[in-house]
Amino acid sequence: MHLTAENLAARRGEDMIFINISFYLAAGEALVLTGRNGSGKSTLLRVVAGLLKPEKGTVIFGDKESPEGQHPGEVSHYLGHRNAMKNELTVAENLDFWRHFLRSTCSSADLSVEDATEAVGLSGISHLPFGYLSAGQQRRFAFAKLLVAHRPVWILDEPTAALDASADRLFAGLIEAHLAKGGIVLAATHQPLGLKNAQELKMTGFAGVDRGVWG
């Protein structure tokens, strides 16, 4: 699997928020978007995830079987600012819904609901309504959605928001494990995710970006 973006541009209202953004990520690679609020990080993630149409440019999720690309929804997870979980349902019911909704085929990489809740360190409270939980607990369980239905590409917008230091480390470990298995990660963040050898794309607003390596 590879993720290729070529000459992307996007508009916010009447103004271009970024232009000419290109990058290539192969299996096992991560790109971290940094920059101030309003610099276009979330917009770029939504464009790559297929949720916003770019002003110009292309995004390709390709592999040997589909060199011309697959639909983002078939091969990627998008975790935005909102957790996309029903407050009235229990954690287990929410995850079971997403497990069945997202799985087009059964994969050996899919975790059970029980294993996913254990992976995010909250196996003992999955019987509780989602709305009963703290913001940090809710964010952990939102991340568990990525584990119950495998997708090779993770697109993450501030994935560690509302988390404490121990949860930050736990999430970094889960992301590193995904990369080690050949996954791809594109993430926007205001703080380091602790990823080894991650590339950085610093967004500064209209047209301005810098490239580097950031851990």
Curated annotation (Swiss-Prot):
Superkingdom of origin organism: Bacteria
Enzyme kind, highest EC tier: translocase
UniProt GO cellular component terms: plasma membrane
MF terms (GO), sorted A to Z: ABC-type heme transporter activity; ATP binding; ATP hydrolysis activity
Catalysed reaction equations from the record: heme b(in) + ATP + H2O = heme b(out) + ADP + phosphate + H(+)
Membrane topology per record: Peripheral membrane protein
Its EC number(s): 7.6.2.5
UniProt subcellular location: Cell inner membrane
ABC transporter domain residues: 3-211
PROSITE patterns: ABC_TRANSPORTER_1, ABC_TRANSPORTER_2, CCMA
Keyword annotations from UniProtKB, A to Z: ATP-binding, Cell inner membrane, Cell membrane, Cytochrome c-type biogenesis, Membrane, Nucleotide-binding, Translocase, Transport
Any Gene Ontology biological process: cytochrome complex assembly
Binding residues annotated for ATP, in chain numbering: 35-42
Chief localization: membrane
Subunit structure: The complex is composed of two ATP-binding proteins (CcmA) and two transmembrane proteins (CcmB).
Function per UniProt: Part of the ABC transporter complex CcmAB involved in the biogenesis of c-type cytochromes; once thought to export heme, this seems not to be the case, but its exact role is uncertain. Responsible for energy coupling to the transport system.
Family recorded in the similarity comment: Belongs to the ABC transporter superfamily. CcmA exporter (TC 3.A.1.107) family.
NCBIfam families listed in its UniProt record: ccmA
Protein name: Cytochrome c biogenesis ATP-binding export protein CcmA
